[in-house]
């Protein structure tokens, strides 16, 4: 079933007609025009169920192998559609992030499923996650990419934090050190501040985080 929002693919010089009944968004949505096929495909991908939570029970090597197999499978299905090269290349990247964002939850699920194991991510898992760039501005409109970004910087930036008191500062520093794109940096810092406010019912204790936010996210045209 579709959520009440869906990413669309648009391209200069191409046309797209959208038909939808607001009272039945999921059941009535369809597309026409030169980009109708691509956007119908994206709708199908949003509905498709391709990830089984039982995968989290696999050991690290088996899990990463399964994630790579899922990516290969979805890419082959995409290539069989014979869409234009520009969309196909972008969609291959989005597919990777759609798997990676689910894979990023593996350590948490693994520890919950096997609490006595004291699991810590090894090089196989860490290398797999780090193979997905966090500086991919072309995909900032894709939810899978944005979700992966947030998960990844939270995982990396909160390492070594003492409890939860200053973990946001560590994440902010990680963003400053690793993110090159001003657009991506602004998105991540905005989400980090928003999450801090929600978790702490305000901005008390967020002096450093807010100083970074104001420095990096101020509109230069104002």
Q: Whereabouts are the PLM-identified features?
A:
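A non-transmembrane, solvent-exposed segment enriched in polar/low-complexity residues
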Residues: 1-87
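N-terminal, charged low-complexity regulatory/assembly segments
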Residues: 56-178
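Residue-level detector of well-ordered alpha-helical segments, enriched
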Residues: 87-96, 184-189, 205
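Conserved small-residue packing positions in alpha-helical repeats and bundles
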Residues: 100, 104, 189-194
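Generic helix N-cap/helix-start motif at coil->alpha-helix transitions
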Residues: 147-150, 182-190
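Long, charged, low-complexity terminal extensions
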Residues: 169-186, 197, 203
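N-proximal helix/coil linker or "cap" segments that precede and/or mark the start of modular domains
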Residues: 194-222
């Amino acid at each position: 079933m579709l959520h009440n929002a869906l990413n669309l693919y648009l391209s200069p010089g191409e046309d797209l007609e959208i038909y939808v009944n607001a009272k039945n968004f999921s059941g009535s949505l369809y597309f026409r025009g030169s980009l109708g096929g691509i956007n119908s495909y994206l709708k199908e991908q949003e509905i498709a169920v391709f990830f089984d939570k039982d995968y989290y029970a696999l050991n690290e090597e088996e899990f990463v192998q399964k994630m790579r197999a899922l990516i290969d499978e979805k890419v082959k299905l995409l290539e069989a559609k014979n869409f234009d090269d520009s969309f196909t290349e972008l969609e291959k990247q989005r597919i990777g992030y759609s798997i990676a964002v689910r894979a990023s939850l593996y350590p948490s699920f693994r520890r919950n499923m096997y609490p006595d194991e004291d699991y810590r991510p090894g090089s196989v898992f860490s290398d797999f996650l780090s193979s997905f760039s966090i500086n991919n501005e072309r995909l900032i409109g894709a939810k899978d990419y944005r979700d992966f970004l947030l998960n990844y910087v939270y995982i990396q930036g909160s390492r070594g934090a003492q409890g939860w008191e200053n973990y946001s500062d560590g994440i902010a520093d990680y963003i400053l050190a690793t993110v090159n794109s001003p657009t991506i940096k602004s998105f991540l810092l905005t989400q980090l501040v928003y999450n801090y406010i929600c978790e702490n019912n305000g901005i008390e204790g967020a002096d450093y985080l807010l100083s970074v936010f104001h420095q990096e996210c101020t509109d230069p045209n104002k």
